[in-house]
Amino acid sequence: MQPMVDPERIGLWGSSYSSAHVIHLSAFDRRVKCVVAQVPLVNAMDNFRRLVRADQFPATQAWLAADRADQYKTGKINYLPVVAPQGQAAALPTQDSYDWFTQTGKTRAPKWKNEQTVRSLELALEYNPAADVHLISPTPFMMIVAQNDTLTPTDLAIEAFGRAREPKQLVIIPGGHFDAYVAGFESAATPALNWLTQHLMK
């Protein structure tokens, strides 16, 4: 451990997919003393089923399997867009995902590429960090959920939070998934800062 790190004051903060990481890590690593999961992915397969129409799901699974077989056979790595206009295939198929990534790419991240590997999507679907959410306790756990989140659905996050043990705190902020980053930044950042300060600075 680096000398500037206080091992008794290690806190984790994650948002969206990285929230999955902090949930999983804090369930098993007691060095973590406080954790905040913002607009979290809690169960990738359940989440994916919300984003893909039921009648298209078997074809999507077959497409992922075909990509895997093709990669093993040819070594070729295939890509798909992270976001795309409605009706086109993308890893994050919600309208607010398209709006946010497109705007952010233009204004704040001009070198960002709108692509990810198909294999990454398939592997991500195996991720179920909330299966172990009950093991986070006694580490203080805060979950920040957007009231109208359609990318990492609000009800999935709240259900996972219900299975966590004390000490815990649920914060519900107005808006959708991406409001936590811009329009609703203060409503998300302030409780997170207070939670980390309360449990790491005492």
Question: What would you call each of these model-derived segments?
Answer:
Residues 145, 150-156:
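Conserved alpha/beta-hydrolase "acid-adjacent" motif
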Residues 13-15, 36-39, 174:
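Alpha/beta-hydrolase-fold catalytic nucleophile elbow
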Residues 136-137, 143-145:
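Short beta-strand/loop motif that positions the catalytic acidic residue
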Residues 175-189:
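Catalytic histidine-centered segment of alpha/beta-hydrolase-like enzymes
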